[in-house]
């Protein structure tokens, strides 16, 4: 997979209970094709949380697609956009 083709998502860290792993909730908004109403969908991703970028619960982070790190982890935390208050 080429670096410029990797998925880049922004979400909120919901849990850091697992070792070296953070659960990140990503929100996607789109307009319903028939009813033209704004629809919000949420999806949770498991992301690798280790090294110089160590996220905590409530942080807004950017996650980047990477090679499979475990059975469920396909993303790593690239940077912290905003710390939790």
Swiss-Prot record:
It comes from the Bacteria. Keywords: Ribonucleoprotein, Ribosomal protein, RNA-binding, rRNA-binding. GO terms for biological process: translation. The keyword Secreted does not apply. InterPro entries: NA-bd_OB-fold, Ribosomal_uS17, Ribosomal_uS17_bact/chlr, Ribosomal_uS17_CS. GO terms for molecular function: rRNA binding; structural constituent of ribosome. One of its GO terms (cellular component) is cytosolic small ribosomal subunit. The keyword Hydrolase does not apply. One of the primary rRNA binding proteins, it binds specifically to the 5'-end of 16S ribosomal RNA. This is Small ribosomal subunit protein uS17. It comes from Mycoplasma pneumoniae (strain ATCC 29342 / M129 / Subtype 1). The gene is rpsQ.
